[in-house]
Amino acid sequence: MQALLFLMALLLPSGAGAEEIIGGVESRPHSRPYMAHLEITTERGFTATCGGFLITRQFVMTAAHCSGREITVTLGAHDVSKTESTQQKIKVEKQIVHPKYNFYSNLHDIMLLKLQKKAKETPSVNVIPLPRPSDFIKPGKMCRAAGWGRTGVTEPTSDTLREVKLRIMDKEACKNYWHYDYNLQVCVGSPRKKRSAYKGDSGGPLLCAGVAHGIVSYGRGDAKPPAVFTRISSYVPWINRVIKGE
């Protein structure tokens, strides 16, 4: 139930709380050219935001719980409160949610967005590599999460892209999440540190040695780590089939 409440909190009206980076730093402008900012019109007509990342010129990866009636993707952004010359705004043609996604267990929290047109590759807009199915990220490794989410439980969302270093944890650290599945998810963030992804960062990447290994999925409502990320390597065959149009 705790995880469910946190997921529900992610899709609040824009500016009132979609997820953010806690304990991190502002990213060097345009140093993460694969980052995508999603503006979502929900089924009830509200506006929400999520993160995402470009995996081909026409596909963005994000979390399944970031789906909505309509989504516009902004690529090449650093400060989303401004209209930057580097930005490319592209509407989503099709939202492909994983067929086994379960809102209540949060399993299979992955979605691909097919853009109406291909993104133009520039120094500020580019794709990020995905892992191979055999690339099973192990506990102890230091990775990074990035996003425009809240910088604190009571803080607003960030206009500028931020990032934070996070440690991959053993599955025991996430044992209090009832439906946590080590084969499908990654337990991220040391309970000893005040560093985490939070509201507004949902759908953003977990970056390990230049490869996207995870997707921000859910965590505690009070933002205390660890949080749960979708394990991308487990979904590579499905991702490839979707991109190929199968």
UniProtKB/Swiss-Prot annotation:
pH profile: Optimum pH is 9 at high salt concentrations.
Activity control, per UniProt: Also inhibited by lima bean trypsin inhibitor, soy bean trypsin inhibitor and human plasma alpha1-antichymotrypsin.
Listed PROSITE patterns: TRYPSIN_DOM, TRYPSIN_HIS, TRYPSIN_SER
Signal peptide range in chain numbering: 1-18
SS bond partners: C50-C66, C143-C208, C174-C187
Molecular function as annotated in GO: peptidase activity; serine-type endopeptidase activity
Source domain of life: Eukaryota
Known role: Has chymotrypsin-like activity. Hydrolyzes the amide bonds of synthetic substrates having Tyr and Phe residues at the P1 position. Preferentially hydrolyzes the 'Tyr-4-|-Ile-5' bond of angiotensin I and the 'Phe-20-|-Ala-21' bond of amyloid beta-protein, and is less active towards the 'Phe-8-|-His-9' bond of angiotensin I and the 'Phe-4-|-Ala-5' and 'Tyr-10-|-Glu-11' bonds of amyloid beta-protein. Involved in thrombin regulation and fibronectin processing.
Protein name as it appears in the record: Mast cell protease 4
